[in-house]
């Protein structure tokens, strides 16, 4: 049996292929050919077709299907042609008999990447491959450009991030990673819904950029004639809802921070925050353990995972991460006391002498701290150097001085400290939580402390929100609050070494700027 020209991989350049295909489509449109039909009736999705895979030959012949998908590969022969068609996560073979097909010309017109509609009956070939034996075949959407082949794949990070649609078509690993991301969010929602939390939405455009220590994005509202800020955190809005009687609330949504981009930071990212009345940070720790342990078992069937990032980041070595409870705990000041040689506590940490000692320690270990060298910034750098690398398995860092946490409640037994923790996995922050400060008098004092840092040049210090202080005067019950970055968590759950690999369309410079 003779074989005609196989156009799986064009023998001409990509540009020539594009020009030729565009010319063909343009001429068809001029001739009023329906190149892009409005609709195509699908009576069986591919996953439904595959439910018949083990049926008998006699039963298969009774199943008439009409479906659609994208051409991956094909072989054209004198009479029989074979097309591999993909839809969602399934690929099926179409067997086309030129003597049966009404529109025979279509066979020579089909190119790799075309989206086709087809109808026929199910069956098996002589080699027992489950297939659809075609009666009708039509092109629903022509592919005007060449798609990279499975053999060579799509490996250039620039193309992967800028043309995610190609990445999803070619790299099954990428598609599975984003499906897992969806599963992670579904798990979080179900976990909170099952505990009677109510999902809410709070504004993305804020008058005051507060709720976290970060640089905001600025925009302008033409009608109101005022500048607004993209939210850096929904925290204060959510606590207002608790004041309003919504005892358990959560939000999953976008946050924006006008800061650097690296392997674990993107200026637009997704987070989950929840607030629970009559709870404290101990309850938040229990819930963090319960949620992450359950999520790991749900996604991987085990409490342990081997974080083996994708091969593009060759310097990242596989690491075993154990989500078994209880998670480890590191007290910030106790750990740093071992480094600086004196006992640090919530009282002496605020002295000028202690700050000088901490700065000297940074200099000794060549730890860079940007100006102004506030206590909060210095502690953050020291924790990042000495404590975070110990947190391979999920670990809580507790023991935060009051000055570092303007929205957290004073510690009930450690003077000068607050009831706060941050959860780290493989040395990266995933969660931040605390017993919420609900004393309006104390909250105003904390905001004044932050205002002093702003005056000293700290552009990440928190801005005073008087409206929130007024809301606190109506009474916020004892409350535990929790925030978690979904992108970083997804990285560890899906073997991604770069945060861009878990964000469908990450922030990128325009190609003309490169």
UniProtKB/Swiss-Prot annotation:
EC code: 6.1.1.6
CDD domains listed in its UniProt record: LysRS_core, LysRS_N
Catalytic activity: tRNA(Lys) + L-lysine + ATP = L-lysyl-tRNA(Lys) + AMP + diphosphate
UniProt cross-references to Pfam families, sorted A to Z: tRNA-synt_2 (PF00152), tRNA_anti-codon (PF01336)
GO function term, MF aspect, one: tRNA binding
Stated name of the protein: Probable lysine--tRNA ligase, cytoplasmic
Biological classification of the source: Eukaryota, Fungi, Fungi incertae sedis, Microsporidia, Nosematidae
Subunit structure: Homodimer.
Localization (cell): Cytoplasm
GO CC, alphabetical: cytosol
Principal subcellular localisation of the protein: cytoplasm
GO-annotated biological processes: lysyl-tRNA aminoacylation
Domain of life: Eukaryota
Family under the similarity heading: Belongs to the class-II aminoacyl-tRNA synthetase family.
Swiss-Prot/TrEMBL keywords: Aminoacyl-tRNA synthetase, ATP-binding, Cytoplasm, Ligase, Nucleotide-binding, Protein biosynthesis
Class of this enzyme: ligase
């Amino acid at each position: 049996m003779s074989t005609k020209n196989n156009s799986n991989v064009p023998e001409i350049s990509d540009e020539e292929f594009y020009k030729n295909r565009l010319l063909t489509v343009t001429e068809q449109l001029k001739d009023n050919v329906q190149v892009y039909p409005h609709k195509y009736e699908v009576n069986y999705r591919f996953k439904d077709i595959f439910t018949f895979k083990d049926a008998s030959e006699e039963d298969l012949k009774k199943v008439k299907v009409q479906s659609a998908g994208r051409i991956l590969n094909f072989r054209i022969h004198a009479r029989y042609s074979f097309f591999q068609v993909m839809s969602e996560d399934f690929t099926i073979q179409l067997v086309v008999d030129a003597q049966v097909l009404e529109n025979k010309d279509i066979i020579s017109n089909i190119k790799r990447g075309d989206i086709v509609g087809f109808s026929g009956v199910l069956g098996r070939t002589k080699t027992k491959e489950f297939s659809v034996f075609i009666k009708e075949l039509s092109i629903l959407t022509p592919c005007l450009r060449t798609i990279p082949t499975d053999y060579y794949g799509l490996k250039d990070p620039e193309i992967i991030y800028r043309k995610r649609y190609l990445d999803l078509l070619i790299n099954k690993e990428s598609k599975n990673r984003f499906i897992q991301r969806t599963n992670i969010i579904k798990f979080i929602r179900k976990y909170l819904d099952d505990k009677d939390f109510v999902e809410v939405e709070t504004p993305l455009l804020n008058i005051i950029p507060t709720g976290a220590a970060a640089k905001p994005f600025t925009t302008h509202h033409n009608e109101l004639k005022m500048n607004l800020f993209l939210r850096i955190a929904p925290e204060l809005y959510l606590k207002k809802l608790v004041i309003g009687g919504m005892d358990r609330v959560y939000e999953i949504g976008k946050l924006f921070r006008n800061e650097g981009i690296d392997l674990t930071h993107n200026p637009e990212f997704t987070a989950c925050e929840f607030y629970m009345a009559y709870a404290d940070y101990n309850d938040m720790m229990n819930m963090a353990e319960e949620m992450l342990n359950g999520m790991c078992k749900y996604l991987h069937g085990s409490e342990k995972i081997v974080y083996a990032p994708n091969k593009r980041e060759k310097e990242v070595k596989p690491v075993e991460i154990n989500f078994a409870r209880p998670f480890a705990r590191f007290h910030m000041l106790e750990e740093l006391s071992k480094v600086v040689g004196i006992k640090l506590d919530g009282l002496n940490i605020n002295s000028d002498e202690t700050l000088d000692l901490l700065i000297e320690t940074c200099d000794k270990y060549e730890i860079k701290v940007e100006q102004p060298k506030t206590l909060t910034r210095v502690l953050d750098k020291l924790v990042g150097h000495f404590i975070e690398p110990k947190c391979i398995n999920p670990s809580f860092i507790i023991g935060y001085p009051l000055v570092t946490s303007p929205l957290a409640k004073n510690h009930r037994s450690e003077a000068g400290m607050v009831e706060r923790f941050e959860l780290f996995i493989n040395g990266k922050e995933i969660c931040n939580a605390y017993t919420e400060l609900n004393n309006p008098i104390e909250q105003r004092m904390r905001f004044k402390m932050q205002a002093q840092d702003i005056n000293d040049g700290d552009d990440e210090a928190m801005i005073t929100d008087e409206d929130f202080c007024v809301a606190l005067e109506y009474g916020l019950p004892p409350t535990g609050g929790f925030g978690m970055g979904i992108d970083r968590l997804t990285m560890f759950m899906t073997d991604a070494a770069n945060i861009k690999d878990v964000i469908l369309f990450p922030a990128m410079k325009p190609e003309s700027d490169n």
